[in-house]
Amino acid sequence: MASLKKSLFLVLFLGMVSLSICDKEKREGENEEEEEEHEEESEEKRGLLSFLPKVIGVIGHLIHPPS
């Protein structure tokens, strides 16, 4: 009976350790995905900011054409 308890506790302990490791890896993967999404968003913003002066220039020429 005592060896059965020890075996059961060992199995439960190893299960908890493996579950903990899996959760940690899952969180790390989620953090990496969030960082990639943030990088993509900042790249999109930079693209918009570089395009904005060109649009303003075209609108300015349409409103006040050069003489």
UniProtKB/Swiss-Prot annotation:
Identify the keywords attached in UniProt to this record, alphabetized: Amidation, Amphibian defense peptide, Antibiotic, Antimicrobial, Secreted, Signal
Where is region (Disordered) located?
Answer: 24-46
Q: Which family does it belong to?
A: Belongs to the frog skin active peptide (FSAP) family. Brevinin subfamily.
Q: Can you name a GO cellular component term?
A: extracellular region
Q: Which named protein is this?
A: Preprofallaxidin-1
Q: In which tissues is it expressed?
A: Expressed by the skin glands.
User: What's a GO biological-process term for it?
Assistant: negative regulation of nitric-oxide synthase activity
What are the subcellular locations of this protein? Secreted
**Which InterPro entries does this one have?**
Frog_antimicrobial_propeptide, FSAP
Q: Which domain of life is it from?
A: Eukaryota
Residue stretch(es) of the prosequence: 23-46
Query: Which residues fall in a compositionally biased region of kind Acidic residues?
Result: 30-42
Task of the protein: Fallaxidin-4.1 shows antibacterial activity against the Gram-positive bacteria L.lactis (MIC=12 uM), M.luteus (MIC=100 uM), S.epidermidis (MIC=100 uM) and S.uberis (MIC=50 uM). No antibacterial activity against the Gram-positive bacteria B.cereus, E.faecalis, L.innocua, S.aureus, or the Gram-negative bacteria E.cloacae and E.coli. Inhibits the formation of NO by neuronal nitric oxide synthase with an IC(50) of 13.3 uM.
Which range is the signal sequence, renumbered to this chain? 1-22
Q: Which Pfam families match?
A: FSAP_sig_propep (PF03032)
